UniProtKB/Swiss-Prot annotation:
It is found in: Cytoplasmic vesicle membrane; Cell membrane. Disulfide bonds: none annotated. It comes from the Eukaryota. Interacts with clathrin light chain A and stimulates clathrin self-assembly and clathrin-mediated endocytosis. The chain crosses the membrane at residues 89-109. Residues 1-21, 177-226 are annotated as: Disordered. InterPro entries: NSG. This is Neuron-specific vesicular protein calcyon. It is a single-pass membrane protein. Residues 206-216 have a biased composition (Basic and acidic residues). One of its GO terms (molecular function) is clathrin light chain binding. Residues 183-196 have a biased composition (Low complexity). Most abundant in brain. Also expressed in testis and ovary and, at much lower levels, in kidney and heart.
């Protein structure tokens, strides 16, 4: 506490006129404080400290509850973390199996549908010989089966030619069939019947005809009638 009316000289019994004349002598000083006044009584503060401790514990309780919730969430996250790798592994296995099936369908299964000696190309079974023949050509033309068929050499003849004798007989029979008339058909029918009976159309037997014309029977043409 500050006590007024004190001076350096330590003489409190001066008059007011002397205080106005000597300003330095009237400067107040801070008196020393008693230590007992600075220390409060502990009897009332015990309850306050107890209440303060109780309030601090009550303030810490939500944090503890929050920690419990965090632990529960951490436990649940750990369980989910254990489940997620299993689901990912199953999904990865399914995707891998699908890729294997697609590759099997595209590479091997389609080739089994074509017979031996054929190869599936552009969803069409093409002969292996044709495929080998056109592998040396331009890949642009090789991609199209129609272009390959169009470029196939036409000089090759896929079949045996008919012999000349049989071809001539076939042509003659065809021409006779086209140019036959009812009368010619009747004559040819009678000649066929006579040949079956062993006689000529005139009614004579073949033996009688040979006796009358021995030269004709020997294969020498007879003289024409005059």
């Amino acid at each position: 506490m500050v006590k007024l009316g004190c001076s350096f000289s330590g003489k409190p019994g001066k008059e007011a006129g002397d205080q106005d004349g000597a300003a330095m002598d009237s400067v107040p000083l801070i008196s020393p404080l008693d230590v007992s006044q600075l220390q409060p009584s502990f009897s009332d503060q015990v309850v306050i400290n107890t209440q303060t401790e109780y309030q601090l514990t009550s303030a810490d309780q939500p944090k503890k509850f929050a920690d419990l919730e965090g632990q529960r969430l951490a436990c649940s996250h750990s369980e989910e973390g254990r489940r997620l790798p299993t689901a990912r592994m199953i999904a990865f296995a399914m995707a891998l199996l699908g890729c294997v099936l697609i590759m099997y369908k595209a590479i091997w299964y389609d080739q089994f549908t074509c017979p031996d000696g054929f190869l599936l190309r552009h969803k069409i079974c093409t002969p292996l010989t044709l495929e080998m023949y056109y592998t040396e050509m331009d890949p642009e033309r090789h991609r199209s089966i129609l272009a390959a068929i169009g470029a196939y050499p036409l000089s090759r003849k896929h079949g045996t030619e008919m012999p000349a004798v049989w071809g001539n007989n076939y042509r003659t029979a065809k021409e006779e069939h086209k140019g036959t008339t009812p009368a010619a058909m009747a004559v040819s029918t009678a000649a066929a019947a006579a040949a079956a009976e062993g006689t000529e159309p005139s009614g004579k037997s073949l033996d009688t005809r040979e006796k009358e014309d021995p030269q004709k029977a020997e294969g020498v043409p007879s003289q024409p009638p005059k």
